[in-house]
């Protein structure tokens, strides 16, 4: 059966998309809007190879594989053993089992040993500074930068990104300024920015960024509302995610 013909069965133990299923009961971070936003938005050009840093359940990896119609190899790197096993199972059950490869590895070590270079790197990274521990060490690792600092992440991506490649991330709005200041100090350049709000009455809470190692002029900025005044999905959000959500 081809990828285009594949229709996943509805199941209660994860999240069913139009063309694949994500089980996430062994992953610290469940399927959520952040990952869906990044997987649907990350700009695709003429990609040769894609890297997903901290892939979790492999959600973003499989979204990108779908968008590329399985023509572009995707390496999905995940430090947590349980999450990496589940990610590999999700990939194996998808139409892109021959396209996406899950690596149980630390991205710092992976970036030093992989022979590949990437035209696109994506990450939904840890974003909180060390604080009150979460209920499980697995969730603490996924949420706090003590497991992967933003500086280490930027250095690791720099080591494997092609000269004209792009690094795309999704971050909480309150830390974007510090992240961009750090990135610029490490010779990264902002290419694209999207400020995301839940609805017109709510402030921006997430930001999508595309960074390059070559200066880009001009920098493109835009805004995205997830829901409208009536709390229905906005036309822009529907257009962005309609290839994935069953309800769209």
Swiss-Prot record:
It is an enzyme of class 2 (transferase). InterPro entries: DNA_methylase_N6_adenine_CS, SAM-dependent_MTases_sf, Small_mtfrase_dom, tRNA_Adenine-N(6)_MTase, tRNA_adenine-N6_MeTrfase. This is tRNA1(Val) (adenine(37)-N6)-methyltransferase. The keyword Cytoplasm applies. It comes from the Bacteria. Specifically methylates the adenine in position 37 of tRNA(1)(Val) (anticodon cmo5UAC). It comes from Musicola paradisiaca (strain Ech703). Its EC number is 2.1.1.223.
């Amino acid at each position: 059966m081809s990828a285009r013909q594949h229709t996943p069965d509805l199941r209660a133990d994860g999240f069913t998309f139009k063309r694949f299923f994500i089980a996430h009961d062994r992953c610290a971070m469940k399927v959520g809007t952040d990952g869906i936003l990044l997987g649907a938005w990350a700009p695709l050009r003429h990609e040769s190879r894609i890297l997903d840093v901290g892939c979790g359940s492999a959600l973003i990896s499989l979204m990108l594989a779908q968008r590329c119609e399985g023509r572009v190899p995707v390496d999905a790197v995940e430090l947590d053993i349980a999450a990496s096993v589940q990610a590999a199972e999700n990939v194996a059950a998808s139409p892109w089992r021959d396209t996406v490869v899950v690596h149980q590895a630390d991205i710092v070590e992976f970036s030093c040993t992989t022979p590949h270079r990437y035209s696109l790197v994506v990450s939904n990274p840890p974003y909180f500074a060390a604080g009150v521990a979460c209920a499980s060490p697995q969730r603490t690792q996924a949420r706090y930068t003590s497991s992967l600092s933003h500086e280490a992440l930027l250095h690791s991506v720099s080591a494997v990104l092609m000269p004209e490649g792009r690094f795309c991330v999704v971050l909480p709005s309150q830390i974007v300024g510090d992240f961009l200041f750090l990135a610029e100090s490490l010779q990264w350049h902002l290419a694209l920015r999207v400020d995301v709000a839940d609805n017109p009455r709510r402030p921006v809470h997430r930001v999508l960024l595309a960074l390059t190692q070559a200066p880009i002029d001009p920098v493109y900025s835009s805004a995205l509302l997830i829901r409208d005044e009536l709390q229905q999905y906005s036309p822009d959000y529907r257009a962005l995610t309609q290839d994935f959500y069953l309800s769209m």
